[in-house]
């Protein structure tokens, strides 16, 4: 059966280009009815180009159809908003008539648009959940460390510890300058940072520009004789040389329970020193930083200390939890960073990191670390791994038990969880928001397996849990939480439909057939495909109709095709309660709810769309055909329908 497709809507100045392509082309006149649009879009099994007049349709209606907006202009006029285009085509590409360049531009932008989908779900989760499972750097970037608990199983960075493997080299890309990268991976939950050796504040100001939110939530005490005055109210400059803990302690208010971080990046000038004197000085400076941090261990949650590898020592000792390479450092910079876990208050539970202690360092091993991971062409993924390792609490979400509201985004169907489907459904049942991959097309960028859509529908819907495909979830949040998910959101609806999303939300009252619930693009085609490939699948339905009875073809084909994910509980309530009303009452409920639809049969407006027995017969027939293969309980739904 075909997978979800996108409608690649181009404005008129691009319509001549798409005629040179090989995808189908859909010309819109502006005179189409709701049903015309629904039936016509349902005939396409691949992405399709479209052009013409769409000004009478709303953004939610067009997103429900899978529209992506492409133009050389900034905006497209729709019925309810002026939509910022999703893909802005450079005018030189439009003038060139180069179809490959045009389609490459669309493809590159669509990959970036995936982030908009994930960010929208995370924005909802940040409002509703405390615990976040399966987390990576994207979650840390927007989490509130004072409120949210971030769990996951991120990839390990290269670390030096006694008797431990360093790790193997991995592909990497360039990143920010070394010291900006340092602040980027170490600053997360700390509210007060004491930064010794801050220099001329250029690094701190670059970090402020890169991450203004994290910069603003920290009180910075910066220490350096050359540090200039700073106008930022959260930066306090101390023009002193730090040589003992006394220089730091007098600037700390111990009546405040805050998380503190100590950064030591001290390096004096070489001046006239010979090699031996210079190395001795450097070694002493690094050890002094460790000693000051360790002596103040009860005041700081952690410390990050400059660590230069001596040339003349095969082995030496330092106080450390981990040594690790520096993202953005030159390939010949034989200098690491020393992370020390200390005993001070922390918002993040870092008990899985060992306490800082005296550690023996073998010089050749840490030199190898530099050779494997340093270089101006490297550092982006190293920085990401360090950020995640230091600030994400390492726990498997499938095994974690807690009473806190939780979010489980983009990890449940990782290949490592194959065979754990019962646990996945249990997590989706108790999560505030969870995602699972259901797409059947080949996956090139992710290591996920697909859950069957019909099983997800039957397993995932409860009185207080909605189960929708990803596009339905975004449309639902646009409708119910317009302050969280804006109508102008840029995302790829076809990509989103490859996910099932569970939301801890009640059934809307009244239970209207909003776009988020009822789209079923291509349902008629799916039904015809079933008939022309295996007519026995429709025999019972045909016989019932000859007898003057009926079954719900919508429900039956939805389950048999495995092409859709929608919420059964809400759908059944919609059929039995809302559709049983007359036309006037139906329209009144839609208006009162501010709901929108993309399918409307005028001949059914005064009648129920189905009755209870139609739904029961559809489920029974699905059970008869697929019950031995279906992993979900169908009997529980039959029992529910008898009493709903």
Curated annotation (Swiss-Prot):
Disulfide bonds: none annotated. It comes from the Viruses. Gene3D superfamilies: Orbivirus VP4 core protein, C-terminal domain, Vaccinia Virus protein VP39. Coiled coil: none annotated. Keywords: Capsid protein, Outer capsid protein, Virion. It is found in: Virion. GO terms for cellular component: viral outer capsid. Its main location: virion. The VP4 protein is one of the five proteins (with VP1, VP3, VP6 and VP7) which form the inner capsid of the virus. Belongs to the orbivirus VP4 family. This is Core protein VP4. The lineage of its organism: Viruses, Riboviria, Orthornavirae, Duplornaviricota, Resentoviricetes. The gene is Segment-4.
């Amino acid at each position: 059966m075909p997978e979800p497709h996108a409608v690649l809507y181009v404005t008129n100045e691009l319509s001549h280009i798409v005629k040179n392509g090989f995808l189908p082309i859909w010309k819109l006149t502006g005179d189409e009815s709701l049903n015309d649009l629904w039936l016509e879009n349902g005939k396409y099994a691949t992405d399709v180009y479209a052009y013409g007049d769409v000004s009478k349709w709303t953004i939610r209606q067009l997103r429900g159809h899978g529209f992506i907006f492409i133009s050389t202009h900034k905006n497209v006029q729709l019925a309810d908003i002026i939509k910022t285009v999703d893909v802005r085509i450079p005018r030189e590409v439009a003038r060139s008539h180069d179809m490959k360049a045009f389609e490459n531009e669309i493809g590159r932008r669509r990959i970036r648009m995936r982030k908009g989908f994930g960010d929208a779900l995370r924005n909802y989760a940040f409002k509703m959940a405390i615990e976040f499972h399966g987390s990576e750097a994207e979650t840390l970037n927007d989490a509130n460390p004072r409120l949210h608990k971030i769990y996951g199983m991120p990839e390990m960075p290269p670390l030096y510890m006694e008797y431990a493997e360093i790790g193997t080299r991995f592909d990497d890309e360039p990143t920010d300058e070394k010291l900006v990268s340092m602040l980027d991976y170490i600053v997360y939950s700390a509210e007060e940072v004491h930064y010794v050796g801050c220099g001329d504040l250029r690094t701190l100001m670059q970090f402020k520009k890169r991450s203004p939110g994290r910069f603003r939530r920290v009180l910075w005490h910066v220490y350096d004789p050359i540090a200039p005055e700073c106008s930022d109210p959260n930066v306090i400059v101390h023009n002193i040389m730090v040589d003992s803990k006394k220089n730091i302690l007098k600037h700390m208010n111990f009546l405040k329970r805050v998380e503190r971080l100590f950064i030591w990046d001290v390096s004096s000038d070489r001046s006239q020193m010979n090699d031996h004197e210079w190395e001795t000085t450097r070694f002493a400076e690094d050890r002094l930083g460790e000693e000051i941090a360790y002596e103040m261990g009860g005041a700081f949650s952690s410390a990050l200390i400059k660590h230069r590898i001596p040339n003349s020592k095969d082995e030496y000792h330092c106080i450390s939890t981990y040594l690790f390479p520096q993202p953005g450092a030159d390939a010949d910079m034989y200098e690491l960073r020393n992370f020390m876990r200390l005993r001070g208050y922390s918002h993040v539970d870092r008990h899985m990191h060992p306490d800082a202690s005296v550690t023996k360092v073998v010089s050749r091993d840490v030199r190898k670390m530099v050779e494997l991971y340093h270089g101006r062409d490297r550092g982006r993924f190293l920085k990401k791994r360090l950020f995640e390792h230091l600030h994400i609490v390492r726990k498997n979400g499938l095994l974690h038990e807690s009473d806190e509201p939780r979010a489980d985004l983009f990890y449940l169907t990782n290949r490592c969880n194959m065979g754990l489907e019962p646990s996945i459904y249990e997590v989706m049942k108790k999560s505030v928001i969870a995602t699972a991959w259901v797409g059947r097309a080949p996956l090139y960028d992710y290591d996920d397996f697909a859950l069957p859509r019909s099983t997800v529908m039957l397993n995932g819907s409860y009185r207080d849990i909605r189960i929708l495909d990803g596009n339905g979830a975004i449309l639902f949040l646009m409708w119910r939480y317009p302050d969280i998910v804006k109508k102008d959101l840029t995302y790829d609806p076809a990509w989103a439909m490859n996910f099932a999303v569970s939301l801890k939300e009640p059934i809307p009252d009244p239970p209207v057939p909003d776009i988020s619930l009822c789209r079923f693009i291509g349902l008629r085609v799916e039904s015809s495909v079933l008939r022309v490939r295996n007519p026995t699948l429709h025999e019972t339905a045909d016989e019932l109709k000859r007898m003057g009875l009926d079954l719900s073809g919508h429900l039956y084909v939805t389950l048999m095709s495995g092409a859709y994910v929608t919420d059964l509980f809400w759908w059944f309530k919609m059929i039995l309660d809302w559709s049983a009303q007359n036309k006037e009452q139906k329209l009144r409920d839609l208006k009162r709810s501010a709901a929108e639809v993309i399918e409307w049969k005028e001949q059914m407006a005064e009648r129920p769309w189905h009755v209870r027995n139609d739904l029961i017969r559809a489920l029974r027939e699905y059970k008869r055909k697929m019950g031995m293969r279906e992993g979900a309980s169908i009997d529980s739904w039959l029992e529910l329908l008898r009493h709903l």
